[in-house]
A protein has these predicted regions:
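Bacterial N-terminal signal peptides
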Residues: 8-17
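Short, low-complexity N-terminal intrinsically disordered segments enriched in polar/charged residues
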Residues: 18-60, 64
Length: 153
């Protein structure tokens, strides 16, 4: 019986540690709470750039060697990602629809990396609304937080 009690205590401690980790704030593990805010600011900047028809502003969130996983498989490099965006979401040099994000959640992957998940929503342009979910991996660079991988579906 004592042997089982020891295992029960160990199990409770382990579960408590997992529960406290799962309930941590989005900025825990990053260098400062402002890091999560900085990543959110990049999302805001890219949304504004997209909606103004400035694809280079949208693409500035990616590192040069970023990868993006879309319905046609992986694209490597920011230029290929730009080509993918132009082919699937732009018409005559402008976005076919307006972009916004919902359910954005940022979780730390250490002091210099983060995971962002959420939903993108494309509306307007006389087209049916399009929406999907994404996971992006971010890294701290000298230029600020940038995406190294984007998986959208």
């Amino acid at each position: 019986m004592k042997r089982y009690r020891g295992w029960a205590v160990l199990l409770i401690v382990a579960v408590s540690g997992c529960a406290s980790h799962m309930g941590s704030s989005e900025s825990a593990g990053l260098r400062s709470p402002s890091d999560a805010a900085a990543i959110r600011a990049v999302f805001d900047m890219t949304t504004a750039g997209w909606n103004r028809g400035e694809l280079p502003v949208y693409l500035s969130a990616y590192t040069e060697s970023a990868t993006a996983m879309g319905r046609n498989g992986p694209e490597r490099g920011v230029n290929a990602i730009g080509d993918q965006m132009r082919a699937g979401y732009w018409k005559t040099g402008r976005p076919a629809q307006q972009l916004h994000y919902e359910h954005l959640e940022i979780r730390p992957l250490g002091p210099d990396n983060a995971l962002a998940t959420g939903q993108y929503v494309l509306t307007g342009g006389g087209l049916p609304n399009r929406t999907g979910w994404f996971t992006t991996i971010w890294t701290r660079t000298p230029a600020g937080w940038r995406m190294i991988h984007d998986h959208s579906s």
